[in-house]
């Protein structure tokens, strides 16, 4: 399997807002992402409980954009298992209750592809979707998966969903032992639209921690599930297994937020169901589908 060389020399964050052309991330991009995941300066801690921490950061050049960073300690979950869970699109449909639809579109290289993901937003906001170029890199016992938004000619914005923009989103998985790891999730996303303050607050105080905990539960159940569902099929580890068609980078273009319709939802009030936690409230995760 081809691999990108991974250097460990420190690098500062690499700017991503001004991206003008579609490129598969290189070594410097992966180092920069790792550096930002590990950075502490400029981040405000908003949640820290039971091994899960959340930080937020306003983007100075555009105050409507916010970065969020979540970190979780995972006991009894090897780094390679968490890496598999994040890659396994069929398993995600089982454990991610927010997903509406998700599928891979095409392969770009042995460690990069293009995919579609749509998700449910807190009521009564409109649901969102995104097309992203995703790339991944094993770095010894650690792993990085990251993505950013692109435009694909066959998948234009849909009328029933708001097309969001991932400026840069990804995961850093760091092994801390044979059966333990730490995962850091870093996201800079333009959800397209003026969101009410309760959405931003709820994302950092409730939604992000809950999503991380649900991912952890899914990791614990993954080995048993995978044994019953094509146990040897892991194209993210064995690219020769990939059934995806190849796609040239020239077929894609960068998805800029300013080219999409802006939705003003700033005055939208939180629904009673969301305030009460809804059917999927804290502590009510339904794991019966993970079998």
From Swiss-Prot:
<dbReference type="InterPro" id="IPR051213">
    <property type="entry name" value="START_lipid_transfer"/>
</dbReference>
<comment type="function">
    <text>May play metabolic roles in sperm maturation or fertilization. Phospholipid transfer protein that preferentially selects lipid species containing a palmitoyl or stearoyl chain on the sn-1 and an unsaturated fatty acyl chain (18:1 or 18:2) on the sn-2 position. Able to transfer phosphatidylcholine (PC) and phosphatidyetanolamline (PE) between membranes.</text>
</comment>
<feature type="region of interest" description="Disordered">
    <location>
        <begin position="1"/>
        <end position="20"/>
    </location>
</feature>
<dbReference type="GO" id="GO:0046581">
    <property type="term" value="C:intercellular canaliculus"/>
</dbReference>
<dbReference type="InterPro" id="IPR041951">
    <property type="entry name" value="STARD10_START"/>
</dbReference>
<keyword id="KW-0472">Membrane</keyword>
<feature type="modified residue" description="Phosphoserine">
    <location>
        <position position="289"/>
    </location>
</feature>
<feature type="modified residue" description="N-acetylmethionine">
    <location>
        <position position="1"/>
    </location>
</feature>
<keyword id="KW-0969">Cilium</keyword>
<keyword id="KW-0007">Acetylation</keyword>
<dbReference type="GO" id="GO:0005902">
    <property type="term" value="C:microvillus"/>
</dbReference>
<dbReference type="GO" id="GO:0006869">
    <property type="term" value="P:lipid transport"/>
</dbReference>
<feature type="domain" description="START">
    <location>
        <begin position="14"/>
        <end position="224"/>
    </location>
</feature>
<dbReference type="InterPro" id="IPR023393">
    <property type="entry name" value="START-like_dom_sf"/>
</dbReference>
<keyword id="KW-0446">Lipid-binding</keyword>
<keyword id="KW-0966">Cell projection</keyword>
<dbReference type="Pfam" id="PF01852">
    <property type="entry name" value="START"/>
</dbReference>
<keyword id="KW-0445">Lipid transport</keyword>
<keyword id="KW-0963">Cytoplasm</keyword>
<feature type="modified residue" description="Phosphoserine">
    <location>
        <position position="253"/>
    </location>
</feature>
<dbReference type="GO" id="GO:0031514">
    <property type="term" value="C:motile cilium"/>
</dbReference>
<feature type="modified residue" description="Phosphoserine">
    <location>
        <position position="259"/>
    </location>
</feature>
<feature type="region of interest" description="Disordered">
    <location>
        <begin position="260"/>
        <end position="291"/>
    </location>
</feature>
<protein>
    <recommendedName>
        <fullName>START domain-containing protein 10</fullName>
    </recommendedName>
</protein>
<dbReference type="GO" id="GO:0005829">
    <property type="term" value="C:cytosol"/>
</dbReference>
<keyword id="KW-0597">Phosphoprotein</keyword>
<feature type="modified residue" description="Phosphoserine; by CK2">
    <location>
        <position position="284"/>
    </location>
</feature>
<dbReference type="InterPro" id="IPR002913">
    <property type="entry name" value="START_lipid-bd_dom"/>
</dbReference>
<feature type="modified residue" description="N6-succinyllysine">
    <location>
        <position position="202"/>
    </location>
</feature>
<feature type="modified residue" description="N6-succinyllysine">
    <location>
        <position position="94"/>
    </location>
</feature>
<dbReference type="GO" id="GO:0008289">
    <property type="term" value="F:lipid binding"/>
</dbReference>
<keyword id="KW-0282">Flagellum</keyword>
<keyword id="KW-0813">Transport</keyword>
<feature type="modified residue" description="N6-succinyllysine">
    <location>
        <position position="197"/>
    </location>
</feature>
<dbReference type="GO" id="GO:0016020">
    <property type="term" value="C:membrane"/>
</dbReference>
